[in-house]
Amino acid sequence: MSYTIREIEKKDNKSVEIVIRTCLIEFGANHDGTAWSDPDLGRFSEIYNSQGNKYWVAEDETGKIVGGTGIGYLTDEICELQKMYCLPDARGKGVANRLMEAALEYAKKYYKKCYLETLDNMTRAQRFYEKYGFYRVDKPVVITEHYACEVKYLKEL
């Protein structure tokens, strides 16, 4: 199966929300303090539409959205890798690599550092982030609504 990485369109909003909620349920993160309770979930095509903010989706050959990730503004020098999720069937097939590469390439145009937050039980994701040069930090760069995400990473761009 081949996958296309492209910018989100309005028609993708509901599909992206389903991908994110499916993954959050899988990891027991379907509660407040995670992306589960984000008020903008399902409106990404509207939210990620300004300079320094962008969201990409991974689409399979049938047109199904199987993953996504975004870059969002935190400070003038620091962005956040946001809402990076892939459905189980799309994992191990290079989809996350291609999403990450698109996000980091974009982030380098506007920022000096990239921050992210994740859950302690998402160990495979943590290894993935470390492979891309992210390193753990003790404190959040800024306070986000994701207070349940206890693991924080930073990367120099």
Model-identified regions with their sequence ranges:
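C-terminal "cap" of GNAT-fold acetyltransferases
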Residues: K112-Y115, L119-L157
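Residues forming the Rossmann-fold NAD(P)(H) cofactor-binding site
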Residues: N97
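Acetyl-CoA-dependent GNAT
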Residues: Y3, E7-Q82, L87-P88, M100-A102, ...
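Conserved G/P- and acidic residue-centered "switch" motifs that form tight phosphate/ATP-binding loops
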Residues: G94
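Glycine-rich ATP-binding loop(s) of histidine-kinase-like ATPases
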Residues: R91
